[in-house]
Amino acid sequence: MTTLRIRGGRPLQGTIRVGGRKNATLPLIAATLLADGTSRLENVPQIHDVMVYRKLLTGLGARVDWDPVHGILTVHTGGVRPGEPDYHLASSIRASYYLLGVMLARYGEASVPMPGGDNIGHRPVDQHFKGLSALGAEIWMDRGIIRARARRLRGAHVYLDIISVGATIQVMLAASLAEGTTVIQNCAREPHVVAVANFINACGGKVTGAGTDTIRVRGVDRLVGATQTVIPDDIEAGTWMMAAAMTQGDVTLQNVIPTHITPIMAKLREAGVEVHELGDAVRVVGRERPKAINVKTLPYPGFPTDAQSQMTALLSLAEGTSYITETLYEDRFRFVPELVRMGAQIRVEGRTAIVKGVEQLYGAPVEATDIRAGAALVIAGLAAEGETTIYGMEHVQRGYEKLEQKLLALGADVQMERQGAAVV
């Protein structure tokens, strides 16, 4: 158990660097197994899920070198063989399911435990199975293990019934070594989908259309290791932006791609927050209480569900009543009772949170139930009067690198307390 103690009421001030995007890094690490030789990933965030993936690849026979100072992960695939990854590790993170398509495409067989990750609602993997089956894979469940095999995958037309980042990437990875051409329709368009496609192409693959709703993958016989820099984390950037606004601070974020955070910037400006784009940096100034606004989560390029919890926290201090509608995951409001403990006035009706802004939040003991809920509680604690103790910070550390270090750099009064296993 990891606990964060926050003595709130201090405006955040200063400059920090945003790390690499978690949701790009994990599929990129999996994708290195598609290629012969050595691949090098740069700007890799030092977070728990990356360390889990490193151990998963090592267990499959890869040699993985990690340079935490420079954020460089190097994967040598010469020793990789088909096998079943460690159950405890693989079932602890959702992104372990990318190993299914990768190992199936490269070795003709794969075994992966049912994925874990945050408990934010129903996130079925049926679209992954549908896509891989269309490519010719035989897939079955065996006592909590997903097993798949195919002599060689063959290109096919795959229509995804729902827009799914995971399924889009899964099919794209598997199709890269399939025989023939695969057309994937109703694709997710997130920048990390594009990042994975770019890596496949750098390795010698033939992927076009990433970033649109239709992706074409012409399979090749062999991929060779390549180097890629992980794109900045849009959700980390958005979290710090909302923290600056909520504490009425002045924070500059380096290593950002403003076009990737357009909906977050737009909503902050609508709420009266100053947002200045400075090339590959963004400055956020919160001079007064935010104004109430309405927010609806949507697939990219809409407002991201992963930033909804933090926006809800921010709007709990807004002037007026805000309506926040969550269209993607039904359990994204599980953190609301924790905010209410701090004095927020929020009522949830179905998939909409009705947030009546208050002038002040107050420190309280609260619990983080997932990555983004925990981030919301952190920024609420920073703005609250008195001391907030957040339990379950190990969830948050799955997605935010060097959190305590960055908070201290911005002038926050915080202390991380660790019990049991060390936190990476």
Curated annotation (Swiss-Prot):
Molecular-function GO terms, alphabetical: UDP-N-acetylglucosamine 1-carboxyvinyltransferase activity
Pfam families assigned to the protein according to its UniProt record, in alphabetical order: EPSP_synthase
Gene Ontology BP annotations: cell division; cell wall organization; peptidoglycan biosynthetic process; regulation of cell shape; UDP-N-acetylgalactosamine biosynthetic process
Subcellular location: Cytoplasm
Catalytic reaction list: phosphoenolpyruvate + UDP-N-acetyl-alpha-D-glucosamine = UDP-N-acetyl-3-O-(1-carboxyvinyl)-alpha-D-glucosamine + phosphate
Chain residues that bind UDP-N-acetyl-alpha-D-glucosamine: R94, R123, P124, V125, D126, Q127, D306, L328
CDD domains membership: UdpNAET (cd01555)
Family listed: Belongs to the EPSP synthase family. MurA subfamily.
Function: Cell wall formation. Adds enolpyruvyl to UDP-N-acetylglucosamine.
Listed name of the protein: UDP-N-acetylglucosamine 1-carboxyvinyltransferase 3
